[in-house]
Amino acid sequence: MGNKQAKAPESKDSPRASLIPDATHLGPQFCKSCWFENKGLVECNNHYLCLNCLTLLLSVSNRCPICKMPLPTKLRPSAAPTAPPTGAADSIRPPPYSP
């Protein structure tokens, strides 16, 4: 009696939500939580949330209070991050400091 083994939680590889840095091309799209932000929006099922509201909502629950679906926790940036080449910093030197 009571000698059952608990199942290990399945680690599902959830899809990444799209991060939209500027939603002006989508028409009048705003965060459905604060209704203020239209930049830095994240897709949450059938609506958008700004990063500030998403962070706040994730600190309280993993479910969206608007659509009741799981909140997105992984983001897919709309543009690949870039950085200058490692050798570029050596060839460009700032001018000497003079007070």
Curated annotation (Swiss-Prot):
* Major localization class: virion
Can you supply one Gene Ontology CC term for this chain's record? virion component
ZnF (RING-type) spans are: 31-67
Where it sits in the cell: the answer is: Virion; Host cytoplasm, Host perinuclear region; Host cell membrane
Task: Note whether Metal-binding occurs among the keywords.
Answer: yes
For the biological process aspect of GO, one term held by this record is: viral budding via host ESCRT complex
Which GO terms of the molecular function aspect are on file?
Answer: RNA binding; zinc ion binding
Q: Which stretch carries the motif PTAP/PSAP motif?
A: 81-84
**InterPro entries in the record, alphabetically?**
RING_finger_Z_arenaviridae, Z_RING-type_Znf_sf, Z_RING_Znf
Q: What is the effect of changing G2A?
A: Complete loss of myristoylation. Complete loss of virion budding
Q: How is it modified after translation?
A: Myristoylation is required for the role of RING finger protein Z in assembly and budding.
- The short sequence motif called PPXY motif sits at 94-97
Keywords of the record = Host cell membrane, Host cytoplasm, Host membrane, Host-virus interaction, Lipoprotein, Membrane, Metal-binding, Myristate, Viral budding, Viral budding via the host ESCRT complexes, Viral release from host cell, Virion, Zinc, Zinc-finger
**UniProt superkingdom:** Viruses
ATP-binding as a keyword of this entry, yes or no, is no
Give the record's membrane topology.
Lipid-anchor
| Stretch list, region Disordered | 74-99
Question: What is said about its interaction partners and assembly?
Answer: Interacts with protein NP; this interaction probably directs the encapsidated genome to budding sites. Interacts (via RING domain) with polymerase L; this interaction inhibits viral transcription and replication, Z partially blocks the product exit tunnel for the releasing nascent RNA product. Interacts with the glycoprotein complex; this interaction plays a role in virion budding. Interacts with host eIF4E; this interaction results in eIF4E reduced affinity for its substrate, the 5'-m7 G cap structure.
Question: Which family does the entry's similarity section mention?
Answer: Belongs to the arenaviridae Z protein family.
State the protein's purpose.
Plays a crucial role in virion assembly and budding. Expressed late in the virus life cycle, it acts as an inhibitor of viral transcription and RNA synthesis by interacting with the viral polymerase L. Presumably recruits the NP encapsidated genome to cellular membranes at budding sites via direct interaction with NP. Plays critical roles in the final steps of viral release by interacting with host TSG101, a member of the vacuolar protein-sorting pathway and using other cellular host proteins involved in vesicle formation pathway.
- Provide the domain comment: Late-budding domains (L domains) are short sequence motifs essential for viral particle budding. They recruit proteins of the host ESCRT machinery (Endosomal Sorting Complex Required for Transport) or ESCRT-associated proteins.
**Any further remarks?**
Inhibition of host myristoylation by the compound DDD85646 leads to proteasomal degradation of protein Z (and not lysosomal), strong inhibition of Z-mediated assembly and budding, and reduced levels of viral replication and transcription.
Q: What is this protein called?
A: RING finger protein Z
Q: Which organism is it from?
A: Lassa virus (strain Mouse/Sierra Leone/Josiah/1976) (LASV)
Q: Which gene encodes it?
A: Z
